[in-house]
């Protein structure tokens, strides 16, 4: 290996961005095939390649950061900026859904009956499952903060307990959301109300699943003593993402479930 005279990490060539892009193509194409032709083959192939890519890319990053020491202070600074920019891009992603919702609801057209919710739509009660979901996510925000403070203070056991509680609450939220979808009195094809509701809450649910995956990886890493009180950016990034998911849900609840009903 050649001598390195700088603190930056020169990454070796990696196939995972390419396989990740391929899995994204397969998943989106697979969704279309599943929706229109009832054929899940491409979707299953896309999900499989996506899981394999995630596993191997995470493995490489953990090896580089924890075992090879490539994540120096200056590298971590770059990763922080990258995570912040990623979350900002996600804010604008969800802003598009809120724009679509408010554009449709603040000035309902005659085709909708001139009212919101549109004529014939029976909205969900915001004080039932949606309120429970809000409580669950707020509680998970508290537990992830507990985990973070425990880690910084060197209380490994407390950190693991708090992180496990956060993961359990995330899974519980996903199950509640799935049951709500199953029992909803309207579908995604029921006009602008159904499409904005299911796309906005569905993408949020997907982000909860992604965030839960991040936290599960952090939990397994902490079981193997990968994090210290001063070197734990992998966990910190996952915590930032989880707080972002919390805040988006609060806006969804107030806008779509409470005001929109």
From Swiss-Prot:
It is found in: Mitochondrion inner membrane. Residues 1-15, 67-72, 153-155, 224-232 are mitochondrial matrix. The keyword Oxidoreductase does not apply. One of its GO terms (cellular component) is mitochondrial inner membrane. Its main location: mitochondrion. The chain crosses the membrane at residues 16-34, 41-66, 73-105, 129-152, 156-183, 191-223, 233-256. Signal peptide: none annotated. Keywords: Membrane, Mitochondrion, Mitochondrion inner membrane, Translocase, Transmembrane, Transmembrane helix. PROSITE patterns: COX3. CDD domains: Cyt_c_Oxidase_III. Residues 35-40, 106-128, 184-190, 257-261 are mitochondrial intermembrane. Gene3D superfamilies: 1.10.287.70, Cytochrome c oxidase, subunit III, four-helix bundle (1.20.120.80). InterPro entries: Cyt_c/ubiquinol_Oxase_su3, Cyt_c_oxase_su3_dom, Cyt_c_oxidase-like_su3, Cyt_c_oxidase_su3-like_sf, Cyt_c_oxidase_su3_a-hlx. One of its GO terms (biological process) is respiratory chain complex IV assembly. Its EC number is 7.1.1.9. GO terms for molecular function: cytochrome-c oxidase activity. The keyword Transferase does not apply. It is a multi-pass membrane protein. It catalyses: 4 Fe(II)-[cytochrome c] + O2 + 8 H(+)(in) = 4 Fe(III)-[cytochrome c] + 2 H2O + 4 H(+)(out). Component of the cytochrome c oxidase (complex IV, CIV), a multisubunit enzyme composed of 14 subunits. The complex is composed of a catalytic core of 3 subunits MT-CO1, MT-CO2 and MT-CO3, encoded in the mitochondrial DNA, and 11 supernumerary subunits COX4I, COX5A, COX5B, COX6A, COX6B, COX6C, COX7A, COX7B, COX7C, COX8 and NDUFA4, which are encoded in the nuclear genome. Component of the cytochrome c oxidase, the last enzyme in the mitochondrial electron transport chain which drives oxidative phosphorylation. The respiratory chain contains 3 multisubunit complexes succinate dehydrogenase (complex II, CII), ubiquinol-cytochrome c oxidoreductase (cytochrome b-c1 complex, complex III, CIII) and cytochrome c oxidase (complex IV, CIV), that cooperate to transfer electrons derived from NADH and succinate to molecular oxygen, creating an electrochemical gradient over the inner membrane that drives transmembrane transport and the ATP synthase. Belongs to the cytochrome c oxidase subunit 3 family. This is Cytochrome c oxidase subunit 3. It comes from Dasypus novemcinctus (Nine-banded armadillo).
């Amino acid at each position: 290996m050649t001598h390195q005279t700088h603190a930056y990490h020169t990454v070796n060539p990696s196939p995972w961005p390419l396989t990740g892009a391929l899995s994204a193509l397969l998943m989106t194409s697979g969704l279309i095939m599943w929706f229109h032709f009832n054929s899940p083959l491409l979707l299953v192939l896309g999900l499989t390649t996506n899981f394999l890519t995630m596993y191997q890319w995470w493995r490489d990053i953990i090896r580089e950061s924890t075992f090879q020491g490539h994540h120096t202070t200056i590298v971590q600074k770059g990763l922080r900026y990258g995570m912040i920019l990623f979350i900002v891009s996600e804010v604008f992603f969800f802003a598009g859904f809120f724009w679509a919702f408010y554009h449709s609801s603040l000035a309902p057209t005659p085709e909708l009956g001139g009212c919101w919710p549109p004529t014939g739509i029976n909205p969900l009660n915001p004080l039932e499952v949606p309120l429970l979901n809000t409580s669950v996510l707020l509680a998970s925000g508290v537990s992830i903060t507990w985990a973070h403070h425990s880690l910084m203070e060197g209380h490994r056991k407390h950190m693991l307990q708090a992180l496990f509680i956060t993961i359990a609450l995330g899974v519980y939220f996903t199950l509640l959301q799935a049951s709500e979808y199953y029992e909803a009195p309207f579908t995604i094809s029921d006009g602008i109300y159904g499409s904005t509701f299911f796309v906005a809450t569905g993408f949020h649910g997907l982000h909860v699943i992604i965030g839960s995956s991040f936290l599960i990886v952090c939990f397994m890493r902490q079981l193997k003593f990968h994090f210290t009180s001063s070197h734990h950016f992998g966990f910190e990034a996952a915590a930032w993402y989880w707080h972002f998911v919390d805040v988006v849900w609060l806006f969804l609840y107030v806008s779509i479930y409470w005001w929109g009903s």
